[in-house]
């Protein structure tokens, strides 16, 4: 397979268990399972999944797309930027949010939105300030001071093409603010969230830096580095392409070891008993999907997000309910994706 970052050859270095291709609850309950195969570029060390068609990639998101982000999370990002670049940083700036078709980073009518599909309420609010297009294939003929790329880069089939087109719309002294999941973090903790179909590329700080250098960009400042990498990026006029050497085989071996430990903790906790599930998001779906037939023992699934209620949990035929006390059984074991003051509960965020 050809590297979708630099065009060189790759080698296969890892395969996941069978995972649901769409990790979101749906109204229909029809799910396809397949493995994710991870390929490492011999030259630039980019990590990518196997090739999928555009039509196949769209199917990973299902028909019942959910809004995964929150206003307070966006507000924290904006505050972090102001703390690093000044409280008036956004004044008189032309701004573009690539991938903001569902949940734009700023509710400001001067912001431009670019996405392959933009919700009607977003179109209505931003008037003519939107581009409904595939940024991997199409260019935007306008220059911006600031471009946001928030949890979008990892979803591109061809990140080099996307970055190249985004760069064309950046003013020479402009900045791109990029946020991606930190793959290094997920090789050690919450490993169930490390590799799945929607994330077509995996980035540590070095992997991200390599992709940017190939496109004559560089990381100006790392704003946050935890389970995510949030950084400012600028054009590199020196044209020096510094490629970091990365031992991807070592990285995936570390993941494999910690992934097995995660599976072991879940199996030991549930001990083949009936159990309740609290939280039905992608993290829970991936955690339970990592263990064969474990969903057969689910008693009830609860989620207080009304958009998920009465929908079907992936890899099962079980409906999701809003939690009420009438369902509560203190003696039955449970697994959750948040802190739950209940005896016999395992919080997957802690493993």
Q: For each predicted feature, which ranges?
A:
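Residues in the short beta-alpha loop(s) of Rossmann-like NAD(P)-binding domains
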Residues: 115-117, 182, 304-305
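Substrate-binding/catalytic lobe of Class I Rossmann-like enzymes that use SAM or dcSAM, i.e.
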Residues: 209-241
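A short glycine-rich, Lys/Arg-flanked "PGG" loop and its adjoining helix->strand segment in the class I
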Residues: 160-175
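Short, glycine-/aromatic-enriched active-site segment of Class I SAM-dependent methyltransferases
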Residues: 17-25, 178-201, 205-211
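Hydrophobic, well-ordered beta-alpha structural blocks that scaffold small-molecule cofactor pockets
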Residues: 230-351
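Conserved N-terminal segment of class I S-adenosyl-L-methionine
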Residues: 1-150, 163, 225, 237-269, ...
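Short catalytic micro-motifs in class I SAM-dependent methyltransferases
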Residues: 150-152, 157
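A SAM-dependent methyltransferase catalytic signature shared across enzymes that methylate proteins
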Residues: 2-12, 205-222
């Amino acid at each position: 397979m050809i590297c979708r970052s630099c065009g060189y050859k790759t080698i296969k270095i890892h395969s996941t268990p069978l995972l649901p291709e769409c990790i979101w609850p749906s109204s229909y309950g029809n799910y396809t399972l397949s493995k994710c195969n991870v390929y490492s570029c011999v030259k630039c060390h980019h990590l990518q999944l196997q090739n999928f068609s555009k039509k196949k990639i769209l199917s990973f998101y299902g028909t019942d797309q959910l809004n995964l982000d929150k206003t307070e999370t966006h507000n924290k990002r904006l505050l972090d930027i102001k703390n690093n670049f000044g409280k008036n940083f956004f004044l008189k700036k032309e701004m573009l949010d690539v991938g903001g078709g569902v949940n734009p980073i700023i509710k400001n009518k001067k912001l431009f939105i670019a996405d392959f599909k933009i919700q009607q309420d977003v179109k209505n609010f931003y008037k003519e300030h939107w581009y409904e297009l595939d940024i991997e294939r199409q260019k935007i003929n306008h220059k911006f001071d600031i471009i946001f790329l928030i949890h979008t880069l990892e979803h591109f089939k061809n990140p080099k093409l996307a970055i190249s087109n985004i760069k064309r719309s950046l003013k020479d002294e402009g900045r791109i603010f990029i946020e991606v999941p930190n793959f290094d973090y997920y090789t050690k903790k919450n490993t169930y969230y490390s590799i799945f179909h929607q994330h077509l590329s995996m980035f540590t700080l070095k992997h991200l830096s390599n992709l940017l250098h190939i496109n004559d960009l560089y990381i100006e400042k790392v704003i946050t580095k935890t389970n995510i990498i949030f950084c400012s990026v600028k054009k590199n006029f020196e044209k020096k392409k510094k490629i970091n050497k990365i031992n991807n085989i070592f990285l995936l071996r570390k993941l494999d070891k910690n992934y097995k430990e995660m599976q072991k903790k879940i199996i030991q906790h549930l001990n083949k008993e009936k159990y309740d599930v609290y939280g039905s998001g992608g993290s829970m779906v991936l955690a339970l999907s990592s263990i064969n037939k474990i969903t057969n023992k689910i008693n009830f699934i609860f989620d207080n997000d009304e958009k998920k209620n009465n929908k079907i949990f992936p890899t099962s035929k079980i409906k999701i309910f809003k939690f009420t006390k009438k369902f509560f059984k203190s003696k039955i074991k449970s697994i959750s994706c948040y802190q739950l003051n209940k005896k016999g509960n395992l919080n997957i965020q802690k493993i």
